[in-house]
Curated annotation (Swiss-Prot):
This is Serine--tRNA ligase. GO terms for molecular function: ATP binding; serine-tRNA ligase activity. ATP binds at residues 264-266, 351-354. It comes from the Bacteria. Its main location: cytoplasm. It is an enzyme of class 6 (ligase). Catalyzes the attachment of serine to tRNA(Ser). Is also able to aminoacylate tRNA(Sec) with serine, to form the misacylated tRNA L-seryl-tRNA(Sec), which will be further converted into selenocysteinyl-tRNA(Sec). It is found in: Cytoplasm. The keyword ATP-binding applies. The keyword ATP-binding applies.
């Protein structure tokens, strides 16, 4: 969440910067609440001073043998007014805090200004899409040939947007996740974590999914107990490991990685990507999270993005990197790069990773801090997250880019050690 001081001192500037994201800040409402807050605070401070003076005069009057009943009545009246004033202050602050929780992060000055994904800026490309000399099949057709993808069985179990994987295709899916985890822990310096797949509301508020995006989440209601939510990404559980903590400078940067299933309702995706594994209610993802000193977060974003790119390079999958524009960035991001992998059957690049610097936005919500050795005081950390990668979409890319004319699939060289001798999926 944004620093409340920004809304008090730079409200119009904040509103202008948020407008570049397509977000309309209710300036009049915030100004009205702030004026009320100041007025009530001034009144309660004056009342407290008067009450203190009256309380002091009670002792003096008592020493002189004077009647203190009127003074006592005044003090009691002021105490009641003070309690009412503090309650009003708390209510105003709660309303301001509620507004803050719905305001997205401010984009960095380096982020391209734009309204939608059409305004994203391509930064670079890697690899060249293969020219096939036969009719390209999509991953659904390839899965039917091998028997490795079964969407009908999944629909019988769970409905639309699920998949059952079998045999070598299931093993290939597992191999991809193992390869990614081994790469990030072995070469990129991340520490592997196994975290809960269900979290409570404060964790989702900490990373920004709540309260604004509850409709995108799967919720488990429990009578008499706190509700659970299925994680939409391991970003939630990994990042919240530092919630409420004050980290030593020597602990930074923290680099965490986890392989988990992710669960999303896809509430706004009706009619999009209904065929295949591109958009599912349940999918696996390897997630990278970094917690860093504020001055190093932009450098860390470049490194995080390079870590995700390395997966695609070793798999020899063509991809491109986009700098997202202000209107297409996620709620909590200061700056985001998307990686898009080439999908032959669609003749275009599709998103496979999103790498974001969230600045102190999540840290403020979580109260995640580090002790700055220069000041000796606790300060907010910066947090970053990125997919390294979405396993299901990577499987789609491998199946389609490594397909042969007969519908068989060559296993990428880097995955062969994980495939138990299987080099071709038929």
């Amino acid at each position: 969440m944004l620093d409340s001081k920004l809304l008090r001192g730079q409200l119009q500037e904040v509103a202008d910067r948020l407008a570049s994201r397509g977000f309309s800040l209710d300036v009049a409402r915030i100004e009205s609440l702030e004026e009320r807050r100041k007025a009530v605070q001034t009144r309660t401070e004056q009342l407290q001073a008067e009450r203190n003076a009256r309380s002091k005069s009670i002792g003096q009057a008592k020493a002189k043998g004077e009647d203190i009943a009127p003074l006592m009545a005044d003090v009691e009246r002021m105490a009641n007014e003070l309690a009412a004033g503090k309650a009003e202050l708390d209510a105003i602050q709660a309303e301001l805090d509620g507004i803050l929780l719905t305001i997205p992060n401010l984009p960095d000055a380096s982020v391209p200004v734009g309204a939608s994904e059409d305004d994203n800026v391509e930064v670079r490309r890697w690899g060249t899409p293969k020219a096939f000399d036969f009719e390209i099949k999509d991953h659904v057709a390839l899965g039917e040939i091998s028997g490795g993808l079964d969407f009908e069985a999944a629909a019988k179990l769970s409905g639309a947007r699920f998949a059952v994987l079998r045999g070598p295709v299931a093993r290939l899916h597992r191999a991809l996740a193992q390869f990614m985890i081994n790469l990030h822990t072995g070469e990129h310096g991340y520490e592997e974590h196994y975290t809960p797949y269900m979290v409570q509301a404060p964790a989702l508020q900490g990373t920004g999914q709540l309260p604004k995006f509850e409709e995108d989440l799967f919720k488990i209601t429990r009578e008499g107990e706190a509700d659970f939510y299925l994680i939409p990404t391991a970003e939630v559980s990994l990042t919240n490991l530092v919630a409420g903590e004050i980290l030593d400078a020597k602990q930074l940067p923290l680099k965490l990685v986890a392989h988990t299933p992710c669960f999303r309702s896809e509430a706004g995706a009706s009619g999009r990507d209904t065929r295949g594994m591109i958009r599912q209610h349940q999918f696996d993802k390897v997630e990278m999270v970094q917690v860093v000193e504020p001055s190093k977060s932009m450098e860390a974003l470049e490194g995080l993005t390079a870590n995700a790119e390395r997966v695609l390079q070793l798999l020899e999958l063509p991809y491109r990197v986009l700098a997202l524009c202000t209107g297409d960035m996620g709620f909590g991001a200061v700056k985001t790069y998307d990686l898009e992998v080439w999908v032959p059957s669609q003749d275009k690049y599709r998103e496979i990773s999103s790498c974001s610097n969230c600045g102190d936005f999540q840290a403020r919500r979580m109260q995640a801090r580090w002790r700055n050795p220069e000041t000796g005081k606790p300060e907010l950390v910066h947090t970053l997250n990125g997919s390294g990668l979405a396993v299901g979409r990577t499987l789609v890319a491998v199946l389609e880019n490594y397909q042969q004319a007969d519908g068989s699939i060559l296993v990428p060289e880097v995955l062969k050690p994980y495939m138990g001798g299987v080099e071709v999926i038929r």
